[in-house]
């Protein structure tokens, strides 16, 4: 018990140090017009009050640093490294979904079973600039498919927006990160097409598999403001066990992800998605959405409030359904540092005769420095 208390105190001290020191020390650093270094350092502490589980709190501190070298407007070399202390509540809670979707300590070690630690991405990109509004780019290396697929202006960043896994990306969409692959980005005026192909080292069953994803997007400018409308389809090779654990099946899914400004103060978003259940899956559908409220409403232009809800329909395993509600207030202290107060309500409903059903509230405080 004393060891656990010491761990909690140490984690709180790390977060306090993050709040107290970073406004002075975190500086954007552009070495020259071709080479730049940036990153994000975050600390979060979450405490759960949950039925059918222990009330407890945990923290984590992830740190990511990235380097970009662009010798000219057509060529770019990029690398990102990730480090973390602690796994937060993610490996402690009985909920199916992670309360914080960040890359934490276990996530940055032996990535995808490749025996690779800390190196998240490293890639080269070449862009054909066919006209002022027409570009075609090709990327190859160790990539993150979520950099190209399932974007959302208001619900896509676990360090500055929602924390819960279901409000960052769709859990049904099985979009992989940090492995070998290539990406295509084609943009003509307001239309865009993106495609991703990846070879992933291993899934939960230890099988290597191929991932294929494509996204069609359109950006609409109207008197309300800018809106982004996307349709994503993805599929894997036949390397995922079925419910009985006997045969291997594909994963196949489709997602729509929309975000729209509603004037200068408000914004709204949705993410709906479905996947087949030939393979064993926790969820076969997600229906999520929310609103963003700019701090301009109370004369703090850089602050914002985010409110989001997700309903996930259970697949062919034990879960009947999961509901998530999350709200946060993000207080921007300066151009580098922001604090977020976060509250989540989660409820897992299981099929008859399954595990006791957890439901409850998770309170969180997150500090994020971007440089």
Please place each PLM-identified region on the residue numbering:
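Transmembrane beta-barrel domains of outer membrane proteins
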Residues: 66-68, 125-127, 183-187, 217-219, ...
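Transmembrane beta-strand segments of Gram-negative outer membrane beta-barrel proteins
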Residues: 29-53, 161, 305, 341
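Outer-membrane beta-barrel pore domains and translocons
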Residues: 42-46, 82-84, 141-145, 198-201, ...
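Residues that define the transmembrane beta-barrel architecture of outer-membrane proteins
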Residues: 47, 57-63, 115-120, 176-180, ...
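Detector for outer-membrane/organellar transmembrane beta-barrel domains
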Residues: 32, 42, 188-193, 214, ...
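Outer-membrane beta-barrel "beta-signal"
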Residues: 291, 337, 358-371
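Short loop/turn motifs that connect adjacent beta-strands in outer-membrane beta-barrel proteins
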Residues: 27-38, 68-78, 129-136, 150, ...
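Surface-exposed coil loops of outer-membrane beta-barrel proteins
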Residues: 92-123, 131-215
């Amino acid at each position: 018990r004393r060891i656990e208390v010491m761990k909690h105190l140490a984690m709180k001290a790390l977060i306090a140090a993050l709040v107290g020191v970073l406004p002075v020390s975190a500086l954007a650093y552009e070495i020259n017009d071709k080479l730049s270094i940036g990153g994000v350092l975050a600390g979060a502490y979450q405490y759960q009050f949950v039925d059918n589980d222990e009330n407890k709190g945990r923290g984590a501190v992830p740190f990511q640093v990235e380097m970009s070298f662009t010798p000219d407007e057509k060529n770019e070399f990029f690398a990102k490294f990730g480090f973390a202390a602690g796994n937060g509540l993610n490996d402690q809670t009985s909920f199916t979904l992670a309360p914080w979707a960040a890359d934490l300590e276990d996530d940055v070690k032996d990535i995808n079973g490749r025996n690779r630690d800390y190196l998240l991405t490293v890639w080269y990109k070449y862009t054909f600039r066919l006209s002022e509004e027409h570009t075609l780019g090709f990327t190859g290396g160790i990539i993150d498919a979520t950099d190209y697929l399932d974007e959302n202006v208001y619900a896509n960043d676990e360090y500055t927006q929602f924390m819960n896994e279901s409000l960052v990306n769709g859990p049904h969409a099985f979009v992989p990160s940090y492995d070998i692959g290539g990406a295509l980005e084609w943009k003509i005026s307001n239309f865009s097409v993106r495609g991703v192909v990846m070879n992933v080292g291993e899934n939960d069953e230890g099988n290597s598999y191929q991932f294929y994803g494509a996204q069609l997007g359109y950006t609409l400018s109207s008197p309300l403001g800018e809106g982004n409308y996307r349709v994503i389809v993805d599929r894997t090779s036949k390397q995922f066990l079925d419910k009985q654990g006997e045969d291997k099946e594909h994963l196949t899914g489709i997602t729509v992800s929309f975000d729209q400004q509603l004037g200068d103060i408000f914004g709204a978003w949705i993410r709906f998605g479905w996947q087949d259940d030939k393979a064993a899956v926790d969820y076969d559908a997600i229906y999520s959405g929310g609103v963003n409220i700019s701090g301009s409403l109370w004369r703090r232009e850089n602050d914002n409030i985010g409110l989001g809800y997700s309903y996930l329909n259970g697949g062919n395993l034990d879960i009947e359904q999961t509901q998530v509600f999350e709200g946060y207030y993000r207080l921007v202290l300066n151009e580098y540092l922001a604090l977020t107060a976060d509250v989540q309500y989660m409820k897992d409903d299981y099929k008859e005769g399954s595990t006791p059903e957890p439901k409850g509230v998770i309170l969180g405080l997150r500090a994020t420095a971007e440089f």
